[in-house]
Amino acid sequence: MKRTYQPSKLVRKRRHGFRARMSTKGGQKVLAARRARGRKRLSA
């Protein structure tokens, strides 16, 4: 059986990266929440 997690740096950046987050309203809310919480890393 094939495992569900097949790591790829490119896909990770495209799906969860900073620019992907900034491109949607919801993503911007995610970043705002992580900033408010004081997260060191905002995105992948």
UniProtKB/Swiss-Prot annotation:
Ranges of compositional bias, category Basic residues: 10-19, 32-44
Keyword Ribosomal protein belongs to the record: yes
Keywords: Ribonucleoprotein, Ribosomal protein
Keyword Ribonucleoprotein: yes
A single GO molecular function term of this UniProt record: structural constituent of ribosome
GO biological process, one term: translation
Disulphide-bonded residues: none
GO CC aspect terms: ribonucleoprotein complex; ribosome
Region (Disordered), start-end ranges: 1-44
HAMAP family reported for this sequence: Ribosomal_bL34
Family according to the record: Belongs to the bacterial ribosomal protein bL34 family.
Alphabetical list of NCBIfam families matching this protein: rpmH_bact
Entry protein name: Large ribosomal subunit protein bL34
Organism: Sinorhizobium fredii (strain NBRC 101917 / NGR234)
